[in-house]
Amino acid sequence: MEAKPFLIKPNQEELEDLTGKKFNSLSEVVDAAKEIVNTGIENVMVTLGGDGAVLVTKDKVYKGTFPKVEIKNTVGSGDSTIAGMAYGLSVDKPMDECFRLAVACGTTNAMVDSTGSIDHEILKDILPKIIIEEI
């Protein structure tokens, strides 16, 4: 990738297309994201559908998971995820908290019928239930 953006957010399928590899484990996804970070892109956040997401930075790797929820519509969840990350960054939250907000926004979007929509009451309920762990 010629441009060196601060952050990219592929889902697993998009990461496979980008790298030309098929992933069978989380460690393979993380390794591919690390390779991308080593090219000069500072952060790679990969969404994994029902398995949460992973964020690879130059110094750390985080895994984000969400509680079992009723999924109504996943359209727009990736956009909602990146919006949560962007908001967190814009208010100078630490990277792990930005990632928590990102996962919470993507999850919240999937819980409502409308596309690319966040219900703030659901978000407030989900946010503390998001588990972020350094791996």
Question: Predicted segment positions?
Answer:
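Conserved phosphate-binding/catalytic region of the ribokinase-like
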Residues: L26-I135
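Conserved beta-alpha-beta core of the PfkB/ribokinase-like small-molecule kinase fold
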Residues: M1-V29
